Amino acid sequence: MKDRYILAVESSCDETSVAILKNDKELLANIIASQVESHKRFGGVVPEVASRHHVEVVTTCFEDALQEAGIVASDLDAVAVTYGPGLVGALLVGMAAAKAFAWANKLPLIPVNHMAGHLMAARDVKELQYPLLALLVSGGHTELVYVSEPGDYKIVGETRDDAVGEAYDKVGRVMGLTYPAGREIDQLAHKGQDTYHFPRAMIKEDHLEFSFSGLKSAFINLHHNAEQKGEALVLEDLCASFQAAVLDILLAKTQKALLKHPVKTLVVAGGVAANQGLRERLATDISPDIDVVIPPLRLCGDNAGMIALAAAIEFEKENFASLKLNAKPSLAFESL
């Protein structure tokens, strides 16, 4: 039987990535051109800068992916691309490249939801058992998603305000940490103690919605008041206290979701899934009867490998798009 190859493109934010998947599960290449250094001085992603960088490197990413995979364009069976959610300018660069490549090589185009990509990155670990529940945590999203079968997604809980990754970056900026701050806060938290009191919004309420704006504001106020009074704060304890509050909220809502939606598998994915503290709490707090599946670190951040793994599901369903496909920066799971 002929091998099947899918080329995938991801450009929803500040990573330009092209990957090649063989036979639905083997990643032969996952080229990632990061822009982190370009955005550090701004303390966050600047959309116009991100779009320009995508334009500069996307062609090279295509070439490098094919070379690393050891195949040529004529070996491919489909092209997949992230069409939302994300920054509209950034999405359009990747989509233009993917559509042009698909047209030139007479290949079908597979539209992929960026968050479905994060979720399906777990397929790199093992074949997933359905139905399952997913906790998706990133810089732009915090969602609990019920997946009844491959490709069938339903959001059952989400943040009312800030995404968890966004909260990490904002408090990191207040402390003078380098963007993105999540990894450094996690490392500092492991050296400190939970000594400062921060709120755990809606942690006892029965619904599955999150809120991190109150926690962020409490952190900023504590830091500001200490500065005004000339009081010293222990950075490690500050990070430990902030992270403890975040993880208490995430774990409480996830456990409630598991009671409301009994499943045997929990996927935890997205950039924040790389957080060591979160991984430790999942190991201790989630019932051993639940199979917790977390993508490897290399697939937690934005990358085209996860888009390819999600695209394999859509390929089986023959969910192809025309070359008129447009970017949907606010795309939700329900509209997939």
From Swiss-Prot:
| Catalytic activity of the protein | L-threonylcarbamoyladenylate + adenosine(37) in tRNA = N(6)-L-threonylcarbamoyladenosine(37) in tRNA + AMP + H(+)
The cross-references to InterPro entries, in alphabetical order and at most eight, read: ATPase_NBD (IPR043129), Gcp-like_dom (IPR000905), KAE1/TsaD (IPR017861), TsaD (IPR022450)
Q: Which UniProt keywords apply?
A: Acyltransferase, Cytoplasm, Iron, Metal-binding, Transferase, tRNA processing
Q: Is the keyword tRNA processing in the record?
A: yes
What subcellular compartments does it reside in?
Cytoplasm
Q: Which domain of life is it from?
A: Bacteria
Class of enzymatic activity (EC top level): transferase
Q: Name one GO biological process term.
A: tRNA threonylcarbamoyladenosine modification
Q: Which cofactor does it need?
A: Fe(2+)
- Residues recorded as binding substrate, renumbered to this chain, are 136-140, 169, 182, 186, 275
Instruction: Please provide, alphabetically and separated by semicolons, the GO molecular function terms listed in this UniProt record.
Output: iron ion binding; N(6)-L-threonylcarbamoyladenine synthase activity
List cellular component terms (GO): cytoplasm
Main localization is cytoplasm
Binding residue positions for Fe cation: 114, 118, 302
Q: Identify the EC number(s).
A: 2.3.1.234
Q: Can the keyword Metal-binding be found in this entry's annotation?
A: yes
The record's remark on the cofactor is:
Binds 1 Fe(2+) ion per subunit.
This chain's function reads: Required for the formation of a threonylcarbamoyl group on adenosine at position 37 (t(6)A37) in tRNAs that read codons beginning with adenine. Is involved in the transfer of the threonylcarbamoyl moiety of threonylcarbamoyl-AMP (TC-AMP) to the N6 group of A37, together with TsaE and TsaB. TsaD likely plays a direct catalytic role in this reaction.
Identify its protein family.
Belongs to the KAE1 / TsaD family.
**NCBIfam families assigned:** gcp_kae1 (TIGR00329), T6A_TsaD_YgjD (TIGR03723)
What protein am I looking at?
Answer: tRNA N6-adenosine threonylcarbamoyltransferase
Q: Which organism is it from?
A: Streptococcus agalactiae serotype Ia (strain ATCC 27591 / A909 / CDC SS700)
